[in-house]
Amino acid sequence: MKLEPLFNLDPNTKVRTRFAPSPTGYLHVGGARTALYSWLYAKHNQGEFVLRIEDTDLERSTPEATAAILEGMEWLNLAWEHGPYFQTKRFERYNQVIDQMIEQGLAYRCYCTKERLEDLRHSQEQNKQKPRYDRYCLHQSEYPVDAPHVVRFKNPTEGTVVFDDAVRGRIEISNRELDDLIIRRTDGSPTYNFCVVVDDWDMGITHVVRGEDHINNTPRQINILKALGAPIPTYAHVSMINGDDGQKLSKRHGAVSVMQYRDEGYLPEALINYLVRLGWGHGDQEIFSREEMIALFDIHSVSKSASAFNTEKLQWLNQHYMRSLPVEQVATHLEWHMKKHGIDYSNGPNLAEIIPVLSERCKTLKELAISSRYFYQDVENYDEKAVAKNFKPEAIKPLAKLAEKLTALSDWTVENIHEVMSQTAQELDIGMGKVGMPFRLAVTGLGQSPSMDITAKLVGKDRTISRINNAIAFIHTQNV
């Protein structure tokens, strides 16, 4: 049968993988891991990665879901060489192949009504037989071609489908277990399993990496490929991802959408690093650069056991990348969160300056953005517990002394601010805590923050002194 490639298939490309999501919802972490494994295997073998949108479910597929999938792939920086291809734009190709299969006796029209099929199923169940089509229409000729019908693939009735799964090893399925699959519906639309076969053939896919829920589809697809005289890809069915309670990962475990992790403040580098370790590893190594993943990844080394999603581990990785990536790169991602939380970061220190300071305490960019407000916005409220502890009348004297000494500073440096704090404590004969804690609450409104010499340096001289004076006025009003 004639092969119609969508692009010039380079005969020197030994590996061509694909990611083929259905646009019926967001890109979830399971799909993202499948995409990552496919992408890594292609890159490891100097191959190509194809993106295909399997949108044959016309009722459930939406443009919004397609956009969300593409956004997720781009955010994860999983670039594709070919695509995205949409199955709904290839119906003519699928039907062309189906018509040729009918002509060659590889498929046949089935005119059976729903009632007949239901009666057949009921009869087989009564006789404790596995429900399957009885090929009643295979040799029928009295029906007009244009009468309502489906098209079925003529599946072999003898023999066994055998394939060596790259993850699970050898799998064998008897053809007696397989039915004559419907490959075209009554409305003329081709079915999912058939579209996948033609796409993998046309696109020269050599390795199919997908979830274990597709294992049952594989022998059916292999039989169609064999009937077409097409090469059979290597299949790799990866395990599901469970929550930390052992149950299938779902919304009740927290975020499951890739972009939801973005919204929660995770870096794409952290999520990629975490996902690659959910089923694959290299010794005891936990941190992998993208270059290391490409160099080391092998689909044959992926575990066939289910993996458990651990949010604490992801947070640990995220904090690592917040600290270790180039600060300008982290700042680019942080900008999105600052805008989302309504923080005008042009009115204060550069984001690159606050990231090293706050990332010691924050595990996500969302936390970091929220924690940074006092660098860019006036303090309107004070933490109540901190007020009760640190804004007593005796705090006025060290605050006033601080304001006086800080005002006199000509060089606003961390070292000079720290020296002012030490001098204030010495001159008033009090501990540094009696100076630092009221100072912190005055400048940040909080009971906790990075060290105050660094914090005040970033807040700026005028704002720092103004906030100290506001705090003194506040303490006076609380103790009238």
Swiss-Prot record:
Cofactor note as given: Binds 1 zinc ion per subunit.
Residues the entry annotates as binding Zn(2+): 110, 112, 137, 139
EC number: 6.1.1.17
Cellular localisation: Cytoplasm
GO cellular component, one term: cytosol
Family: Belongs to the class-I aminoacyl-tRNA synthetase family. Glutamate--tRNA ligase type 1 subfamily.
Name by which UniProt lists this protein: Glutamate--tRNA ligase
Gene that encodes the chain: gltX
